């Protein structure tokens, strides 16, 4: 695929940057993480593929996002993958923060938010509402919900990816996302995501 500009908020094992370098060589990637030792350890133990264009920033994700916006930086994708759930940092959630991240997108950009939650998915329900509010304010479609189908049917614990951005409203996008997995995959459009949030509130 063609190179893209991606902002990763949360480094982890740098798995996604490696994948992007393999599938979209030449992509410009910025990784922000507060844990300097984690990033250094990962790079020492698992060096990035040759040619990877990656800038590592040690900073709070929200402060870094604000600085990038002030500098006029824009990205084709912003990926928020920081420990979430009820115990996560409160300033890295909610409609205002998601709105700040949406402002960092190019016209064709997409925001992806990885959410881990306990059984009942009450945190997910709250964040669905928050991202819906932020997307409406920014004038972009969202949120879409991507997860294991059984998990959402049972309101079971696990990980969910929420997405918002102009390209998601294009014809055939839901089908392409479902084909990508996990299988069986649930890909909920904004109306279906709102219905899921309502079901969580009633449970």
Predicted regions: what is each one?
Residues 1-107, 121-122, 155:
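The AdoMet/dcAdoMet-binding core of the Class I SAM-like
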Residues 10, 49, 53, 67, ...:
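Serine/threonine-rich low-complexity intrinsically disordered regions
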Residues 26, 51-53, 108, 139-140, ...:
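A generic structural signal for alpha->beta connector loops
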Residues 38-40, 60-63, 108-112, 144-146, ...:
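Short C-terminal domain-edge/linker segments immediately following a structured domain
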Residues 66, 70, 136, 182, ...:
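Generic surface-pattern signal
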Residues 89, 95-168:
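C-terminal substrate-binding/active-site "lid" region of AdoMet-derived donor-dependent transferases
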Residues 152-203:
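SAM/dcSAM-binding transferase cores
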């Amino acid at each position: 695929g063609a190179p893209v500009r991606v902002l990763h908020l949360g480094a982890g094992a740098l798995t996604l940057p490696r994948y992007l370098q393999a599938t979209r060589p030449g992509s410009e990637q910025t990784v922000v993480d507060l844990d300097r030792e984690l990033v250094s350890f990962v790079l020492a133990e698992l060096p990035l593929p040759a040619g990877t264009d990656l800038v590592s920033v040690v900073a709070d994700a929200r402060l870094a996002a604000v600085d990038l916006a002030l500098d006029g930086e824009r990205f084709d994708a912003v990926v928020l993958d920081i420990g979430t759930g009820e115990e996560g940092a409160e300033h890295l959630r909610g409609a205002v923060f998601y709105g700040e991240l949406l402002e960092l997108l190019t016209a064709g950009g997409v925001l992806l938010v990885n959410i881990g939650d306990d059984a009942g998915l009450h945190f997910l329900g709250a964040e669905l509402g928050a991202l819906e509010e932020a997307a409406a304010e920014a004038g972009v479609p969202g949120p879409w919900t991507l997860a294991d189908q059984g998990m959402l049917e049972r309101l079971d614990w696990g990980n969910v990816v929420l997405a918002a951005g102009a390209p998601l409203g294009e014809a055939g996008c839901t089908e392409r996302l479902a084909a990508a997995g996990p299988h069986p995959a649930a890909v909920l459009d904004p109306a279906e995501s709102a219905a899921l949030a309502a079901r969580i509130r009633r449970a």
